[in-house]
Amino acid sequence: MSVIETATVPLAQQQADALLNVKDLRVTFSTPDGDVTAVNDLNFSLRAGETLGIVGESGSGKSQTAFALMGLLAANGRIGGSATFNGREILNLPERELNKLRAEQISMIFQDPMTSLNPYMRVGEQLMEVLMLHKNMSKAEAFEESVRMLDAVKMPEARKRMKMYPHEFSGGMRQRVMIAMALLCRPKLLIADEPTTALDVTVQAQIMTLLNELKREFNTAIIMITHDLGVVAGICDKVLVMYAGRTMEYGNARDVFYQPVHPYSIGLLNAVPRLDAEGETMLTIPGNPPNLLRLPKGCPFQPRCPHAMEICSSAPPLEEFTPGRLRACFKPGEELL
């Protein structure tokens, strides 16, 4: 099924054959000042070979969504709702089963590759360790497979690089190592948390192209967590726009980009710098994201919204206003454009 066809399929039907189904996901942290709800009743689904972009400002709950799915929440975190992977519930799995799942079927690329790699071990040893532990390969087999995967992520002189330490690599090269490590066990789902944040724009483009190629080659589903809408436009099939832990808008990437139906989505898109806007004032969203301990009454975006109305003091329901698209706003979508 193509991306365009997916956009017109009702969400219930999309969920029926999805690889990952997330329903009413809720993440709460206990703090000395009270409970903080970082993720509030999140719903989405993802098929094999699809890429979902989760976008929003810092503090919107993007990374905590990923950590919840990976079982990596901080000790003071609590999780609720449901997440099924290949029909199996994965939230609150026993540690042993969770480790097996993370190693073999779900992998994650973290934001800073330098802190994700062991500085005291050669890169090759770190790659081989994954295969020897989870695929029961011999040292020689693991070495050759690691070289093949480094070749797959376009690492120049892959065999030579196996003997090098992380500090001998550039930022872009280290990120390629992390992608190779994440794909060694051929996972069905790859979660990428701001994988290009610390990289220059040229390397960003190379990493995005690489992820697209690997998605096609291995039919891997990808969750791309980012605040960079340019990244989303280049790789994602579907987009989930988050604010204060909640879904503001969800749908096909083309629709969200060209026909956004939530003031927050429109604000994010308007804030993207344009090459043809020389001399024009850069647009921003006024104000700051809310304190999650003291959320405004009703819609959390209300204090910053240029279209706020009296009714916005009540929380807008998240509705499927057309097949495959969700929005949480009282203002009619056609009046926002």
Protein language model features and the residues they cover:
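A short, flexible loop at the N-terminus of ABC-type nucleotide-binding domains that lies
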Residues: 15-19, 28-41, 72-78, 94-97, ...
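Conserved ABC ATPase "signature" region
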Residues: 88-89, 141-160, 269-270
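ABC ATPase NBD coupling module
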Residues: 76, 90-107, 125, 133, ...
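Short catalytic/signature loops enriched in Gly
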Residues: 12-18, 156-160, 250-337
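Conserved ABC transporter NBD signature motif
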Residues: 79-89
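P-loop NTP-binding/switch modules centered on Walker-like glycine-rich loops
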Residues: 71-72, 188-195, 199-280
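Conserved signature/switch motifs of ABC ATPase nucleotide-binding domains
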Residues: 103, 167, 185, 209, ...
